[in-house]
Amino acid sequence: MLDYYTTWVKLCFLWGTGEDEQDGYDPKGKQWALGGDTWVVGCKIPPEAVVFPEFNDLNPDEHDPRYNTEHGVYAPHCGLDELMFAWGHDEYMYRMLVANNTAIPREGLDIIRYHSAYPWHDRGAYKHLMKPEDEQRLEWVQLFNKFDLYTKDEGNDLRGNFTEDLWPYYKGLCEKYGLGGKLKW
């Protein structure tokens, strides 16, 4: 299913390089722009969505009847497209790509948007909000995540002076998928 020779997949991996480059990370900086798991907002936060669910009680939404039920503001099986996710780097990049009418196919956009939604694709949360056609989207994200951030081999650290060598190739990929020139950010 995930063909390494499919060029748009390479752009999905390229998108994640910002997380690799945060060695000098400043905790006072804009961490939301670099990494972090995401979850659905507008409904009860399931315990499997966060590392320390005992802190969910500190969230005002936990006490708001509009948001503190299993479905919250959503209809059962409304589908992924109807859900709002916590804002982060994934959602930002997804919206930027859509705003620029990228030619990256739906599968690639789903990978970018949902790959940090670990409660959904890794822990089985939100199935009650999925449409049947969302199952294939789940398969794509799960397949991609086998090769993503947390599974990288530290022995294959590609940081260094590769930019000049790789720039022409990736610039060509960006142009192929409608991301050359000026972009709407």
Which residues does each predicted region cover?
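C-terminal helix/juxtamembrane-tail motif
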Residues: 167-185
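Divalent metal-dependent catalytic cores for phosphoryl transfer on phosphate-bearing substrates
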Residues: 1-164
